[in-house]
């Protein structure tokens, strides 16, 4: 018996098959491009997050030289502490105007936060720390940034003429330097057994 084609029946031609195949390939290509783009974006964001995390976890500064303290032999306490800071290797410039120094005395549970001041004539010893620029890239007109090769000599005033802290012989105390970016730099100190007018403190 011969085959008969019913009226209105249509065959699936080679041209139609090619069009469908091209459509599938185009959609697959676009989908792959979107996925690859999302993958590259996620990778970039991941790298930025890791880089930011490393910067936040790493201290940008370090101590240079000795930590020197002045004391009152009358009141038997430390009156001020001076130390010098510089950038750590590979550290980013630090805006000292946004850097806070906290002094803690665990024995008494006392602490005070101090802000930056480089003008001795307007210094408020109770709420500010003083910075004397030993070396600045700007010469005699330093800005507020601690940059590579620069050295900033920091003085904090501790007794009743300053922050109002009473640090006596053998007392432990901590000076924390908190930059706007990077980890806090803690300096753990101990007052000597005997208070002198001038002392070198050990970490």
Curated annotation (Swiss-Prot):
InterPro entries recorded: Flagellin/pilin_N_arc, Flagellin_arc
Q: Which domain of life is it from?
A: Archaea
Any one GO biological process: archaeal or bacterial-type flagellum-dependent cell motility
The alphabetized UniProt keywords are:
Archaeal flagellum
Pfam assignment, any one: Arch_flagellin
Naming one, the record's GO cellular component terms include: archaeal-type flagellum
Give the GO molecular function terms: structural molecule activity
Where does this protein reside within or beyond the cell?
Answer: Archaeal flagellum
- Propeptide residue interval(s): 1-11
So what family is this one in?
A: Belongs to the archaeal flagellin family.
* Function (record text): Flagellin is the subunit protein which polymerizes to form the filaments of archaeal flagella.
**Which NCBIfam families does this UniProt record tie to the protein?**
arch_flag_Nterm
From the Swiss-Prot or TrEMBL record, give the protein name.
Probable flagellin 1
